[in-house]
């Protein structure tokens, strides 16, 4: 940060820190604004060391000014910062950014008047728009585009891969260029040949449209006059550099370079849309995303939209508020439609921070607690817990204080526990297994009524089945253990209900 902050020192730094950001505002320029401006210049492939001198600031302003019409708020803020820095280097006293812009406009007007006066006297040696310059004899000649400019353009394409900021960068680097210079810039792009093919198709369509709207006049060209350019001439394929310079410097001039650049920008817009398929309608702020990051994503996608400036302004006024998260949306609506982005930023500093996250977490936990309470209220009757050991309700066998019952609680046999029991039948309170093989519990009469149908005749040819033998044997055993009961009196003693 030390190298970035060394742009101003001593008295210049003191004057810098006394200038207000806005007329009537409270915030002033600080050292961090210089650091931010140097980083933004590197992002736009410009040299940050130019900020250290007056002439360097002037060159930066000449490159940034053409892109202001289609640039974002960040580009405009960078331009305003360089203007204030230029005033500090010049020693021009200003109070705020607006006064610095007025001083720059006055200086530009004076420069134009001096150039016009020198041209009228015939003693002008000031060059016109680069790359068409005047030689020592006063003739307008073409100066080829510099390798440094081509290197900056290639670096931008390689790093950004046709993101929205490539278009204003192309406009800044191709200011005043001829069609031949523009073709040189396009030919230096090595990769992205699919995008280059799309660009060629757009250029061919625009050239055909130009030929349709500007038909060739019949007859030969009068002597001393230049022929009218065709679409292929504007694209630089059928015209020489002398013809291009002649069209651009004739009276009235035919700006073939600007026309060709406009065609290229149309193609670049389509390429940017292809490389940025996200729609502006899909840009929504996350619940934990800061407002600054959301605005950056919003404007980056907005630059890739194929729409007029009026439509983009409507998108900014409507969608920026509509797609914000509930916290930021409430703040935006409270600020009203006249609020600026610079004034909105302090209002959203707490959103997404630790305190805000803690408050959101507390609200979420409170809502979850309320929902759990509501669910408990609508639950059914409480399930009754019963002990397997003593048979009483209100506790389980693990917490039972009664003596532990021996044997398995399921089948009644000893030697294993209920969880390891392999017997599918369960013992009832009389000790009999349930369900029994006969399908009747032990506290019911074990003998079934005999059928009224006559028995099957047996001629002695069939042996008694083993299953019938086992059934007879089990009946005899049960009759010995429990004699046949005709009433419950023998089981329960004197039962008044059985009398």
From Swiss-Prot:
One GO term describing the cellular component: host cell cytoplasm
Zinc fingers, CCHC-type class: 385-402, 406-423
Keyword DNA-binding set for record: no
Site (Cleavage): 130-131, 361-362, 428-429, 444-445
Any Pfam family matching the protein: zf-CCHC
Alphabetical GO biological process terms: viral budding via host ESCRT complex; viral translational frameshifting
TM region(s), chain numbering: none
Residue segments, region Disordered: 435-499
GO molecular function annotation: RNA binding; structural molecule activity; zinc ion binding
Ranges of compositional bias, category Basic and acidic residues: 460-479
Job description of the protein: Matrix protein p17 targets Gag and Gag-Pol polyproteins to the plasma membrane via a multipartite membrane binding signal, that includes its myristoylated N-terminus. Also mediates nuclear localization of the preintegration complex. Implicated in the release from host cell mediated by Vpu. Capsid protein p24 forms the conical core of the virus that encapsulates the genomic RNA-nucleocapsid complex.
Name of the protein in its database record: Gag polyprotein
Organism ancestry: Viruses, Riboviria, Pararnavirae, Artverviricota, Revtraviricetes
């Amino acid at each position: 940060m030390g190298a970035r902050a060394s742009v101003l020192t001593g008295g210049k730094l003191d004057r810098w820190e006394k200038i207000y950001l806005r007329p009537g505002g409270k915030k002033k320029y600080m050292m961090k604004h210089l650091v931010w401006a140097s980083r933004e210049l590197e992002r736009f492939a410009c040299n940050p060391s130019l900020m250290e001198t007056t002439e360097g600031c002037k060159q930066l302003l000449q490159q940034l000014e053409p892109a202001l019409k289609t640039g974002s708020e960040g580009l405009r803020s960078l331009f305003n910062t360089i203007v204030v820095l230029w005033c500090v280097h010049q020693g021009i006293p200003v109070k705020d950014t607006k006064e610095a812009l007025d001083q720059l406009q006055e200086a530009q007007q004076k420069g134009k008047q001096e150039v016009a006066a020198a041209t009228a006297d015939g003693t002008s040696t000031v060059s016109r728009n680069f790359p068409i310059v005047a030689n020592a004899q006063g003739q307008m000649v073409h100066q080829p585009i510099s390798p440094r400019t081509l290197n900056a353009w290639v670096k931008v394409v390689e790093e950004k891969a046709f993101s929205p900021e490539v278009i204003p960068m192309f406009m800044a680097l191709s200011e005043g260029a001829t069609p031949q210079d523009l073709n040189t810039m396009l030919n230096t792009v090595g990769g992205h040949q699919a995008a280059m093919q799309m660009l060629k198709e757009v250029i061919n369509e625009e050239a055909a449209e130009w030929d349709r709207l500007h038909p060739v006049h019949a007859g030969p060209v009068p002597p001393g006059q230049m022929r009218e350019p065709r679409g292929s001439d504007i694209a630089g394929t059928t015209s020489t550099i002398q013809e291009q310079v002649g069209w651009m410097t004739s009276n009235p001039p035919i700006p073939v370079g600007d026309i060709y650049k406009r065609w290229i920008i149309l193609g670049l817009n389509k390429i940017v849309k292809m490389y940025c398929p996200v729609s502006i309608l899909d840009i929504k702020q996350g619940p934990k995303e800061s407002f600054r990051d959301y605005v950056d994503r919003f404007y980056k996608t907005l630059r890739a939209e194929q729409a007029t400036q009026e439509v983009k302004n409507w998108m900014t006024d409507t969608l920026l508020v509509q797609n914000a998260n509930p916290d930021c949306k409430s703040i935006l609506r409270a600020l009203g439609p006249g609020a600026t982005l610079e004034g909105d930023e302090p209002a959203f500093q707490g959103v997404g921070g630790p305190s805000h996250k803690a408050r959101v977490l507390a609200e979420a936990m409170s809502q979850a607690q309320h929902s759990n309470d509501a669910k408990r209220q609508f639950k059914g009757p409480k399930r009754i817990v019963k002990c397997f050991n003593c048979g009483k309700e209100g506790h389980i066998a693990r917490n039972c204080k009664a003596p532990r019952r021996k044997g398995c609680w399921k089948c009644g046999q000893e030697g294993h526990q209920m969880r390891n029991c392999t017997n599918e039948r369960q013992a009832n309170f009389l000790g009999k297994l349930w369900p029994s093989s006969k399908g009747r519990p032990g506290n019911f009469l074990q003998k079934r009524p005999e059928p009224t149908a006559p028995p099957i005749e047996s001629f002695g040819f069939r042996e008694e089945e083993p299953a019938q033998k086992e059934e007879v044997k089990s009946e005899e055993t049960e009759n010995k253990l429990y004699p046949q009961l005709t009433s419950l009196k023998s089981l329960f003693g004197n039962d008044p209900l059985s009398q």
